[in-house]
Amino acid sequence: MIIIPAIDLFDNCAVRLFKGNYKEKKIYSSEPWKLAEGFAKNGATLLHLVDLNGARNQLGINEDSILKIRKTTSLKVQLGGGIRDKEKLAYYDKIGIDRFILGTAAVTDPDLLKFALDNYGKERVVVAVDAIDGIVKIAGWEKDSGVRYRDLMDRLAKAGIEHIVFTDIAQDGTLAGPNLKAYQEILNSYPFQVIASGGISSLKDLMDLSSLKTKIPLYGVITGKALYEGKLDLAKAISSI
């Protein structure tokens, strides 16, 4: 299980939201590329980068920060937020993004999902399944899709998706701990390589996730707020798992 530090970009700053609420955001840095450099020095290998403006269809706002992060860090980068057409995929491929995260498009545009798989391969395509009360949220978590996350996962498995990020929005940004039951059910029911996201607050949370009794082990865990608030030491976490 790998530990994946997160940077969420809003207006070119690193921020964290509380339960996905844009009105409850806290700014942690106006130089997010420096955060990425620090994560690399502490032993991370993969960065989870989210364009929050892009997720709300406010395109291009964080472009400079995304480019600078890509140019200044040795980390592999998986990027999501607003990837809803072939042109955006091609652009991110051109600037060296390693993995593309599709969220809204995975629900609303199965043709784009197939295009991404066919042209970039299963290892580079990740689907974000973001849910609250069992229902998938889209468009920056501001709209209900009307689709239950288990139904979406059934579709993704049939489409050949191998990698997903599952976020329990009710836990995200709360430091209240992960939804262990949900991850256990998913890992026992589907063939995905699953990355957990939402609620991580301590090394104990990571240990609890890594020790889940499941058919497939958890692939990785995303953590953001716990790092920024000093609740979790990245180097220690990486060496302990």
Curated annotation (Swiss-Prot):
Family under the similarity heading: Belongs to the HisA/HisF family.
Pathway assigned in UniProt: Amino-acid biosynthesis; L-histidine biosynthesis; L-histidine from 5-phospho-alpha-D-ribose 1-diphosphate: step 4/9
CDD domains found in the cross-reference section: HisA
EC number: 5.3.1.16
Name this protein carries in UniProt: 1-(5-phosphoribosyl)-5-[(5-phosphoribosylamino)methylideneamino] imidazole-4-carboxamide isomerase
Class of enzymatic activity (EC top level): isomerase
Keywords of the record: Amino-acid biosynthesis, Cytoplasm, Histidine biosynthesis, Isomerase
Places the protein is found: Cytoplasm
Entry superkingdom: Bacteria
Gene Ontology cellular-component terms listed: cytoplasm
Native species: Leptospira borgpetersenii serovar Hardjo-bovis (strain JB197)
Annotated catalytic residues: D8 (proton acceptor), D130 (proton donor)
InterPro entries: Aldolase_TIM (IPR013785), His_biosynth (IPR006062), HisA_bact_arch (IPR006063), Isoase_HisA-like (IPR044524), Isoase_HisA-like_bact (IPR023016), RibuloseP-bd_barrel (IPR011060)
HAMAP family linked to this entry: HisA
Molecular function via GO: 1-(5-phosphoribosyl)-5-[(5-phosphoribosylamino)methylideneamino]imidazole-4-carboxamide isomerase activity
Biological-process GO terms, alphabetical: L-histidine biosynthetic process; L-tryptophan biosynthetic process
Catalytic activity of the protein: 1-(5-phospho-beta-D-ribosyl)-5-[(5-phospho-beta-D-ribosylamino)methylideneamino]imidazole-4-carboxamide = 5-[(5-phospho-1-deoxy-D-ribulos-1-ylimino)methylamino]-1-(5-phospho-beta-D-ribosyl)imidazole-4-carboxamide
